[in-house]
Amino acid sequence: MISESLLLVFLIVFISASLLKLLFVRENKPKAHLKNPPSPPAIPIIGHLHLLKPLIHHSFRDLSLRYGPLLSLRIGSVKFIVASTPSLAQEFLKTNELTYSSRKMNMAINMVTYHNATFAFAPYDTYWKFMKKLSTTELLGNKTLGHFLPIRTREVHDIIQFLFHKSKAQESVNLTEALLSLSNNVISQMMLSIKSSGTDSQAEQARTLVREVTQIFGEFNVSDFLGFCKNLDLQGFRKRALDIHKRYDALLEKIISDREELRRKSKVDGCEDGDDEKVKDFLDILLDVAEQKECEVQLTRNHVKSLILDYFTAATDTTAISVEWTIAELFNNPKVLKKAQEEVDRVTGNTQLVCEADIPNLPYIHAIIKETMRLHPPIPMIMRKGIEDCVVNGNMIPKGSIVCVNIWAMGRDPNIWKNPLEFKPERFLEGEGSAIDTKGHHFELLPFGSGRRGCPGMPLAMRELPTIIGALIQCFEWKMLGSQGEILDHGRSLISMDERPGLTAPRANDLIGIPVARLNPTPFRQM
């Protein structure tokens, strides 16, 4: 029989434990009383899937206009939080940066990028930090970019010569494809020392694969959002992703094996240090790091392959897309084009082709690039995955939510920009706008993201964009063709500015036109 004293002790312990549990729960759930962001009515199982159109960032903007700048959506079983103001962007990307420093991987990304070997979609951990440091100091540092200046210069010269020959023949050019070839040639030479020349070349294969990768990464796969469909390949994504992965892996395996054999031969010949003048490409740098046994992170073969894919994907599409949008906007805004040409003519004297050394003297070209990226950011939304519960503007944001900062919508918001749909580069040269840059410090303009996960390729992009755009408008006018092949009346007929879906935000239709030489002969610098 239990004594009264023992029963009393038991009761005291029970009551104390209950009180402690109650206090613990209350202490650890201080956010339970907080409101959730507004949300449209949902349908069981699919959530808000029925409200989305192919251009997701457009759909998110339309819903935000109705329900507010902080919006909660459920796509199947996945919760999305849409943020559409600079202050909210700052909350997620700066104030709570560590909470939102990871990304969600879908099935296609996971399969194509060697599962956990990717850098672009890796969680914010030791591996990611190491790769970010390697990218910013070695792969895309000022010294490395300086070494590759002759490659970038030569590629700009090549496209100008190509367009000049087309101009003499009065032949049309698919500028979309030409710009993709240019950006692919630059990054493939920087990474692998190969250049696209003919349909059977390694760089050409890589370019084809990159376009397939960006397409499948940006497409909607129902299996990523509906749990009961996870193991069902209803849309054939798994089959496509596996095919892309196999072809890419075979291509990279051949390139890496050939390079390793060349490195072994150099060591046997006693040339392992190479010529002091020899510039190492990205692959050599990565293989050097992989061979370091005492390295902070041991790079595997899959790490090397995945990183090359990350950079091919990022550098090929986004640069070409930004130049293409810029040329389209300049055609539709002839006064802006004329002013830009006058600036380039003044700086170069039309005796030499614009080059990277001229960039500091081209403020209007810089303003044009900012204005293009305001209206047409190459990546329309910054997406982050929350690793813990967070409170933003008095709203409870649950752990695991996918936060989408809709930078495309912010660029067109009349509460942020005066006459937002007008293409007016002067807004970045006058008043407060003159202080706005693209480095992620000004949350109304985030074409390269912000903070730790900001795009490491920004220094390369901001060398290429002014030079390519400057050279194109310095050397040519354009007779642009419409959807039916008709020549558009410059100043009256406008190029369509429709978009198509994808990981990036490209134009819906290829940009095709007949180049008309402004300068004859075309000026070239000595290489």
UniProtKB/Swiss-Prot annotation:
<keyword id="KW-1133">Transmembrane helix</keyword>
<comment type="similarity">
    <text>Belongs to the cytochrome P450 family.</text>
</comment>
<dbReference type="GO" id="GO:0016717">
    <property type="term" value="F:oxidoreductase activity, acting on paired donors, with oxidation of a pair of donors resulting in the reduction of molecular oxygen to two molecules of water"/>
</dbReference>
<keyword id="KW-0560">Oxidoreductase</keyword>
<protein>
    <recommendedName>
        <fullName>Cytochrome P450 93B16</fullName>
        <ecNumber>1.14.19.76</ecNumber>
    </recommendedName>
</protein>
<dbReference type="InterPro" id="IPR001128">
    <property type="entry name" value="Cyt_P450"/>
</dbReference>
<dbReference type="GO" id="GO:0051553">
    <property type="term" value="P:flavone biosynthetic process"/>
</dbReference>
<keyword id="KW-0408">Iron</keyword>
<keyword id="KW-0472">Membrane</keyword>
<dbReference type="InterPro" id="IPR002401">
    <property type="entry name" value="Cyt_P450_E_grp-I"/>
</dbReference>
<dbReference type="InterPro" id="IPR017972">
    <property type="entry name" value="Cyt_P450_CS"/>
</dbReference>
<dbReference type="GO" id="GO:0033511">
    <property type="term" value="P:luteolin biosynthetic process"/>
</dbReference>
<keyword id="KW-0349">Heme</keyword>
<dbReference type="GO" id="GO:0005506">
    <property type="term" value="F:iron ion binding"/>
</dbReference>
<feature type="binding site" description="axial binding residue">
    <location>
        <position position="455"/>
    </location>
    <ligand>
        <name>heme</name>
    </ligand>
</feature>
<comment type="function">
    <text>Functions as a flavone synthase II (FNSII) that catalyzes the direct conversion of flavanones to flavones. In vitro, can convert liquiritigenin, naringenin and eriodictyol to 7,4'-dihydroxyflavone, apigenin and luteolin, respectively.</text>
</comment>
<keyword id="KW-0479">Metal-binding</keyword>
<dbReference type="InterPro" id="IPR036396">
    <property type="entry name" value="Cyt_P450_sf"/>
</dbReference>
<keyword id="KW-0503">Monooxygenase</keyword>
<comment type="pathway">
    <text>Secondary metabolite biosynthesis; flavonoid biosynthesis.</text>
</comment>
<dbReference type="GO" id="GO:0020037">
    <property type="term" value="F:heme binding"/>
</dbReference>
<keyword id="KW-0812">Transmembrane</keyword>
<feature type="transmembrane region" description="Helical">
    <location>
        <begin position="5"/>
        <end position="25"/>
    </location>
</feature>
<dbReference type="Pfam" id="PF00067">
    <property type="entry name" value="p450"/>
</dbReference>
<dbReference type="GO" id="GO:0016020">
    <property type="term" value="C:membrane"/>
</dbReference>
<keyword id="KW-0284">Flavonoid biosynthesis</keyword>
<dbReference type="GO" id="GO:0016709">
    <property type="term" value="F:oxidoreductase activity, acting on paired donors, with incorporation or reduction of molecular oxygen, NAD(P)H as one donor, and incorporation of one atom of oxygen"/>
</dbReference>
